[in-house]
Swiss-Prot record:
Residues 1-30, 370-394 are annotated as: Disordered. Belongs to the AIM44 family. This is Altered inheritance of mitochondria protein 44. Residues 370-382 have a biased composition (Polar residues).
Length: 716
């Protein structure tokens, strides 16, 4: 037995300690199983769970008697043994012994009209028929009722002394004063007790208990007034008053507990809100109209209103002054930080960082300045207190910015005195070269790589971009991009280095212009034989060599450059040949026009027949080309307005200079027709010939059209 007991303790190592906090007669309550009940057959109604909650009454009486005699088992240990699911006496783990210390919850039904059906309503005969119908009916018994009926309980239950002793002892308790606790039912929060009996309980004991319950309910003669219900602790002391008024309260509660809806919910579409706002608007407008009428009718109120408005203005001025004084107060650093002010930055911004901003202003002020020093100080003050947009950077981006902007060393030493001296010197007379050099140095800046500075944060937080570890600013401050070692070098060495090392970010237009002007000095047009041989005017533009670190980029650029050079040479040869031939032809035609009309007779001109035949063949060829082009040009439409305006001007005057004149073979005589248009053509190549600078060409007006074969630099 001892081994078995020890084994059971070992098996029950994770003890359930929930029921240790509960004491009383219900601590050893357990759900009865079908094995512990009698062997007689029962119907389904008697086997219902509502009627099988309590153990047999004889067992309960024995346990209560033992408890009063002092030989009872400790209720805590008993409840632990009975409530343990791992006990050997329980083969089924899901439906074993159960600790039913406190079954009360808030889901029990409230005091209603059905909750007052007492056990005393049934007689002994009716009780046998409905033995279990009353077991779940709640009854509320106050302390006054129990004290009032103590004598009746003792007289009716005088048969069994043990029951009387237990009942009186239970009824003597202060808070849980209900008769049903004597039979080990479960008290709820509101002292409504459920007396649950088993089918195995004897009829005699149940009858004796039920006889004790025949109590007279207090009669309700009037509807009581609504009184405030106290807390649960004070509920038992005022249970009589609550018991008398609970029925009427429940009736009123059922009436009042219906769903209420406010007027705003009933009003669809927010009309209530609309009408209230409209009423407020009308009220304001009406008040304004009333005040306006009063001001017009009564003059004395006008003065009052003026006085009032003046007082309001003075108050507003006072408030504005107060707000400005509050703004000018020294605020803490965390408040400044919220306003975009970074601590200890504006103080560290000296003239070194402000000179690029200040110096251009001095040059503007100098000519017309009557009091330059005062203006300079104001501009400095404005620059000092100028708010700059703070650009927040992460530590990684600050580390990435390897180059930091600082000002020039000469400009670092320049103070307000130097700037004032420059201004005074400009007033007194012309600028000396030393002052000019000093002023230029103040404007210049530089990049110093990885150099610490007091105003580092101000410069880093300026809007800028980082390209190849170089900070390129996006602000209006003009910093000249120079390396830090360049100041020490002489001017000649700087020129040599600039020629060798051209910065990627600086494109110097002066060098490009010099190269282009050297290679594109187009000389005056010469005769066609010289133009054929001379190729100097059609050289291509050399590209500026860029210093790149990557070798593959250099190789690809060299290949592209060679290809472009070859292509340009081929185009140059072709264009020089074609253009030279056409210029030669125009020159010859111009010379023929200057000498006079072309005639077929060889004796009238000093030119040979060979020349005349070639000219006539050229003219006829141009005629046939023009006729072909006329067919296509009829269907063309000019889209752009500029070309259409140009064409409209040239259509009447200079349309096709490829056909300088038209030759007509008539039957009567081989001469030109009288319908002609004469134009004076000013050519650049004719300037060297003096008298041949201008020439008059006669064309047919209908055949004059614009041509793309005009020679270069010919002005029509």
């Amino acid at each position: 037995m001892e081994k078995q007991h020890l084994q059971s303790h070992i098996l029950r190592e994770p003890e359930r300690k929930k029921t240790k906090s509960f004491h009383g007669p219900q601590s050893d309550f357990k759900f009865p199983s079908t094995e512990s009940l009698l062997k007689n057959e029962m119907d389904e109604y008697h086997l219902d769970n509502h009627h099988l909650l309590n153990d047999s009454i004889p067992r309960v009486n024995v346990t209560t008697a033992n408890m009063h005699s002092g030989s009872a088992i400790d209720s805590d240990t008993n409840s632990q043994i009975l409530s343990d699911y791992t006990s050997f006496s329980n083969p089924n783990s899901s439906n074993g012994y159960y600790s039913f210390a406190n079954i009360s919850d808030n889901t029990t039904s409230r005091n209603g009209p059905n909750s007052y059906q007492s056990y005393g309503l049934f007689s002994n005969d009716e009780l046998q028929e409905t033995e279990y119908r009353h077991t779940l009916d709640p009854e509320k018994i106050s302390s006054n009722d129990t004290n009032h009926n103590n004598g009746y309980i003792h007289s009716t239950a005088g048969n069994d002394t043990q029951e009387n002793n237990t009942e009186t002892k239970v009824l003597g308790r202060g808070i849980s004063n209900s008769i049903s606790t004597a039979n080990h039912s479960i008290p709820t929060i509101e002292n409504i007790s459920y007396r649950i009996e088993s089918a195995t309980s004897s009829l005699k004991s149940s009858k004796s208990v039920i006889q004790t319950k025949r109590l007279e309910r207090p009669s309700i003669n009037r509807v009581p007034t609504i009184t405030r219900i106290g807390s649960i602790a004070s509920y038992s002391s005022s249970s009589l008053n609550v018991g008398t008024s609970s029925l009427s309260l429940n009736r009123k509660r059922s009436n009042v507990s219906s769903l209420k809806r406010s007027g705003a919910i009933r009003c669809k579409g927010g009309l209530l809100y609309y009408f209230t706002t409209m009423g407020a608007k009308f009220r304001k407008q009406f008040h304004k109209m009333r005040m306006a009428i009063k001001r017009k009718l009564f003059g004395y109120q006008r003065s009052n209103s003026i006085h009032r408005s003046a007082s309001i203005k003075s108050e507003l001025n006072k408030k504005a002054k107060k707000s400005t004084s509050i703004k000018n107060r020294p605020v803490t650093s965390h408040l400044k930080r919220t306003q975009g002010y970074i601590t200890n930055l504006q103080r560290s911004m000296s003239y070194k960082s402000l000179e690029p901003v200040l110096v251009p202003r001095f040059t503007d002020i100098m000519p017309n300045a009557t009091s330059p020093m005062r203006k300079i100080s104001n501009s400095q003050k404005a620059a000092n207190y100028k708010k700059t947009a703070s650009l927040r950077r992460t530590p990684s981006s600050i580390r990435r910015a390897a180059s930091v902007f600082t000002s020039h060393n000469n400009s670092a030493n320049a103070t307000t005195e130097n700037l004032a001296n420059i201004v005074h010197a400009t007033e007194e007379g012309p600028k000396s070269p030393e002052l000019l050099h000093q002023q230029n140095n103040t404007i210049k800046g530089k990049i110093s790589r990885s150099q610490g500075h007091s105003s580092l944060n101000t410069i880093i937080r300026e809007p800028s971009i980082v390209v190849r570890n170089k900070v390129i600013p996006l602000s209006m401050k003009h910093y000249a991009i120079k390396e830090e070692d360049e100041e020490k070098l002489s001017s000649d060495e700087i020129k040599e280095e600039n020629e060798e090392n051209i910065d990627e970010y600086v494109i110097k237009t002066e060098q490009l212009e010099k190269q282009i002007s050297n290679k594109h000095n187009i000389t005056n047009l010469e005769p066609a034989e010289e133009i054929d041989n001379d190729d100097s005017s059609f050289d291509d533009v050399d590209f500026v060599s860029m210093d790149n670190d990557n070798e593959h980029l250099l190789a690809s650029e060299i290949i592209k450059k060679n290809e472009s050079e070859q292509l340009q040479k081929m185009l140059k040869q072709y264009l020089t040949h074609v253009i030279a031939q056409r210029i030669k032809l125009r020159l010859q035609l111009a010379k023929f026009q200057e000498t006079g009309k072309i005639e077929r007779e060889s004796n009238s001109s000093h030119y040979d027949d060979k020349h005349l035949s070639t000219l006539v063949s050229l003219i006829s060829e141009q005629e046939s080309r023009n006729r072909r082009s006329q067919i296509f040009e009829k269907s063309r439409t000019y889209l752009s307005s500029e070309t259409s305006s140009e064409d409209s001007i040239f259509n009447h005057a200079t349309s096709d200079l490829a056909l300088p004149f038209q030759y007509k073979n008539t039957s009567n005589d081989n001469v030109y027709s009288s319908d002609r248009l004469s134009l004076s053509i000013h050519t650049d190549f004719g300037e060297s010939q003096g008298k041949h600078s201008t020439s008059v060409l006669s064309f047919h007006a209908q055949d004059v059209k614009r041509s793309l074969t005009l020679p270069i630099s010919m002005k029509v």
